[in-house]
């Protein structure tokens, strides 16, 4: 019997390691792995690495924009960038869309905004904020979110009704108790708000303008203290937690220490922390501003070590786009803090991790797909194995190219990777057996993606 699709002769990353073999797909699922399989459609992957499609566990899509952020990043452009970049599934953050996703009503608004606009599959985070502790967390659970998100650092615009808010200590404690009852994971932006806010205000008042000065207002200890607090509260409440975008080795070490004590905690870092360092930020400009900030070369080397040894569970983009005017300033303190990166996870990470640092292909696939899928219970995602969704990214190794602005599918062609030579290329992306991007034909016109509801 012929399968609907067979991917032939690729170097396929399996649970047991990589092997040159064929993969057969029927009804959007992987149905066979082996030699000499036959299919109605055949993709010749000779010379290519066949990886599970990336599961990017940290992406912001600003849809709906609520009249405030309508030009930031919608589902159409954001998911097109995912397709071109080899991301077949992402976890969408509950901000910066208006309204923020914090209860049944706002979750339904978000689902409605994405109807017939998704080129990839999307899991959802619900927010934990001071205003949704009555019943919002339970409503989000019933509405199918795959996890929750809160901010310890300051976030949101208080002048915009319905924008996201960071938690105070009581809201964190009470929110964790409620999330614990759902059994789902609370992802945490861990920075000390009072100290970073004050240091930033003082630096701005003193006339500081550089990105180096901005980094100095968010010192390592402000990240570590917030991680320690989150872990302490997790011990008290039994809440499963995940620390987002860790930018320092000391933060990872706190997570590892807590794991050894039996706490259900994991952490991620982001592609940009593994690629850029503080000393080059001002030459690049505000396009590379984010929080926590990009730290020095020693911190980057330590993060890479934790990636290689598994202390960092997975790597994300923290794709946080905005309009060009919010980056067009000579004062780093006035610029929007967020990096557009979802289109250049797979190629940059393959080059930096596998080709330059010798990470195994199995480790690569775990880092971009299996581990995030497991953490957020995306049961059909993350692995090339029989019965899983047929989600693949085909990668051409040792194929350098220079990224140009016109290559980007984002609504706003902003990225710190523009002009950089990237040493691998995404050749094709497949979602549940359907090609959603091919290098020779571009991104599909179809909207085959769905919201995953847990």
From Swiss-Prot:
Needed cofactors: Zn(2+)
Entries under CDD domains matching the protein: L-HYD_ALN
Functional pathway: Nitrogen metabolism; (S)-allantoin degradation; allantoate from (S)-allantoin: step 1/1
Modified residues (N6-carboxylysine): 149
Keyword Hydrolase assigned: yes
Binding site for Zn(2+) 1: 58, 60, 149, 318
Class of the enzyme per the UniProt entry, highest EC level: hydrolase
Cofactor details (free text): Binds 2 Zn(2+) ions per subunit.
Recorded GO CC terms: cytoplasm
Function as written in the Swiss-Prot or TrEMBL entry: Catalyzes the conversion of allantoin (5-ureidohydantoin) to allantoic acid by hydrolytic cleavage of the five-member hydantoin ring.
NCBIfam families: allantoinase (TIGR03178), PRK08044.1 (NF005960)
Alphabetical list of HAMAP family matching this protein: Hydantoinase (MF_01645)
Subunit structure: Homotetramer.
Entry's family note: Belongs to the metallo-dependent hydrolases superfamily. Allantoinase family.
Protein name per Swiss-Prot or TrEMBL: Allantoinase
